[in-house]
C-alpha cells in the first residue's frame, strides 16, 4: 500500500512524524477494504485512493440515497485515481450528485472538490461546508439535506477542527447511523485542535444515540455506543493521569512544573526526545489547558516558562491523593 496519505497536515496536539514507525506497524494490521462497497441500500462507500499512515486505507467518500440524485460526503485528497473511480462508479449506477457535504477543511477531505466540479459543472454552487470557502454554501448545526431514500441532519462537532461536522442518517425502520468524519475513526483514536471542544463533541455524539458509525477513515463502526464509551474513557483517563502526577509532585513539596517536566513525571525520563517533544508534550499541553478551563489546574510564569500546578494542592484544601485516586482531587472552580 503506497503512502499517498502521508501528508504532514496535522493538528497542533499531535505530530505524527514522531510516530512513523508505530503508524507504519498499525497500517500493516488494518483490514483491507474494497475500493467500492455498497454498505447498505442507502450508503455506498468509495475509497479516496490515498492510503497512508494518517489516512489508513484512504479517505472514505460516502454516496447517500436510493434514487438517481444523491448526496456525497467528503471528496478525498484530490487523487486522479479517485476522480476516475467515482466518475466510473456513478455512471455505471446511473447516479447524479445533488449536493456535496464536507465534514471539515482538511485537504484529505476537500481535495477532490475541484475534480467533482470539473466532472459535474452543475455542482459548482452545491458544495457545502461549515465556515465555507469562497463559492461554497454554509452548513449550520441541525440543517437537513434530503434526497430520495435519505435524510441527513448536520451536527456541529468542533474539536478535531473548529468547523467539523458530523451527519446523522435518519430513516425510519433502520438503526440510526452517523457519519462521524474525523472525530471518531474506524480504527484507533483521532487528533484534535482543542481538547475541551473535542470532549464536548464526544458527549454530543453519544447523546444522539446512533447505533452505527461511518467514519471518514477505516471500517464501519458496528457498535458506535461502545466506541464512544471507549473514547470518553481514554480521554478521561489521560486527565486523571495528569491530575495524579501533579498531585504527586505537589505532595513532595514541589510547587509547579513545566509541560516537559510533567511528561517526564508521567512517562519517565527514558522517552525518545522526538516523541516527547513533538507528540506527548503537545497533547499533554491540550489536557492541561482543558483542566485549566475546568478550574482544576492553574499555572504561573517563571523565568519565561509556564509552570502548572494542581489548584487544590496550592490552596491546601485537601490531602494529597493516593496513586490512582485522582477523583479525590477533582473540585469545581
UniProtKB/Swiss-Prot annotation:
Biological pathway: Pigment biosynthesis
CDD domains per UniProt: LACTB2-like_MBL-fold
Keyword Metal-binding: yes
SMART domains with a match to the protein in the record: Lactamase_B
Induction: Expression is down-regulated during biotrophic growth within tomato leaves. The expression is induced at later stages of infection when conidiophores emerge from the plant and produce conidia.
Keyword terms, alphabetized: Hydrolase, Metal-binding, Zinc
Catalytic activity from the UniProt record: atrochrysone carboxyl-[ACP] + H2O = atrochrysone carboxylate + holo-[ACP] + H(+)
UniProt remark on cofactor binding: Binds 2 Zn(2+) ions per subunit.
Pfam short name (any one): Lactamase_B
Residues that hold Zn(2+) 1 according to the record: 104, 106
Active site: 108 (proton donor/acceptor)
UniProt binding sites for Zn(2+) 2: 108-109
Gene Ontology biological process terms, A to Z: secondary metabolite biosynthetic process
The EC number(s) this enzyme carries: 3.1.2.-
Molecular function GO terms recorded: hydrolase activity; metal ion binding
Cofactor(s) of this protein: Zn(2+)
Function of the protein: Atrochrysone carboxyl ACP thioesterase; part of the gene cluster that mediates the biosynthesis of the bianthraquinone cladofulvin, a conidial pigment not required for virulence but that plays a role in fitness and resistance to environmental stresses including UV light and low-temperature stress. The pathway begins with the synthesis of atrochrysone thioester by the polyketide synthase (PKS) claG. The atrochrysone carboxyl ACP thioesterase claF then breaks the thioester bond and releases the atrochrysone carboxylic acid from claG.
Family: Belongs to the metallo-beta-lactamase superfamily.
Protein name: Atrochrysone carboxyl ACP thioesterase
Organism: Passalora fulva
